[in-house]
Amino acid sequence: MELLVEKNIKNALKMPVSSGGQTIGEYEPRAYPQVIKYMGSKAQILDFVGDGLSAVSAHGRPLVDLFAGACAITAGFGDRFKVVSNDIQEYSSVIASTYLKRAESIGNFDLVALASVIAERNIAELPATMHYPATSTLASFNKIEKCNRSLLMKEFSTSHHLFTQIYSGTWWSAEQCIWIDAIREVLDGLYQDGHILKADFNFGLTCLLHAMAYTSQGTGHYAQYRDAKTVEGMADINKYRRTSVPVIFRRKFDLLLAWHLKHVVDLDHELVALDYRVCLGKIKKSVVYADPPYAFVHYSRFYHAMETLVRYDYPELQFMKDSVVKGRYRVDRHQSPFCIKTQVQGAFVDMFEGVKDSKSDLLLSYSNTGMINIDELIGLANNTFGRGYRVWFEEMNHTHMTMGRSKDRSRKVMESLIIAKKL
């Protein structure tokens, strides 16, 4: 079958009224507060995605955010569509909840004050050798780091010590980890005792994910923490070591809650954490937005700590040569077929078939940093969707965030939106 490749959708996008009777302006995304640092975030291209939604006359159908990640699409269009926000990583549905589900009770509690009772008691029990002074020699600083990391082998009797045990001296200090555990303990207690509902719990957890991100000494993700090898590097790491988790948490909590109460309307949104194939098998006729993590590295390697905070399940950690790997990776972290060269084609075919089976339309984000050539991808789309669909794409320049601390913090990429519309 001859490939149907149309590189320009400008004529479709210039139409003042779509076939569904909706003007293009109705697909403009709302402004929203971001909560975590996330590589490849689509927050900068929401207008571009809105044009794609207009081109398929999306109004009146659910919007399925199939690989929601940090939830840029979910957040940007959650006031205009019923959103099905899906990602196999559970932290994504927690963030999505903050943009989609009303948290009516969480503002009644001072979470920091409640957590301080727990945190201050546990911090007082830390040996003096674990505290970070404002200034230090490189050798002394690394001794403190090693002392913090020694908590990995300690036996704890408290109910909430996951971060203190696993992550002290890595991306966070022991003191910061104690605060993370304490806030999580308060949220668990309020939820289990019925003082807050699930949406409130998720809101608080989202703010804690934010506090984690902005007190971490890493580069914006959790692949590996930095070692202090130079005086300059030590000074930068120590700046983050001495940053207050409760201060960052409370600041974000107040700002985010003000936005949340003003803008969030529950349009019968759905939050799911499923394999993309399972999710597609459950949907009705929709518009599916897909931004799969097709790169040579697995995103779970970068965001496993967030998944662990959300699941709070004291995971088994990966070992190498009888030692826990530096990244503190979970043994069960997700491995995406889109990140495996031998599986990526089949993964896309499965996605196309799932969209076709539900008679949905597809908006697929593609960037030229991916593992598969765009012509090859469009060929797969045409062969899978067949004559019952029209397939085309549009391009734009986009700055992709790499999360490097100094060099190559971002790079220019060509972002494409591949569109498959049922005829």
Residue ranges and their predicted role:
Residues 333-386, 395:
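Conserved Class I SAM-dependent methyltransferase catalytic core
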Residues 374-378, 385-423:
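Class I S-adenosyl-L-methionine
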Residues 59-113, 297-311:
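Conserved S-adenosyl-L-methionine
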Residues 2-64, 72-80, 95:
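S-adenosyl-L-methionine
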Residues 295-358:
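SAM-dependent methyltransferase catalytic-core segment centered on the flexible catalytic loop
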Residues 96-169:
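Conserved phosphoryl-transfer catalytic core
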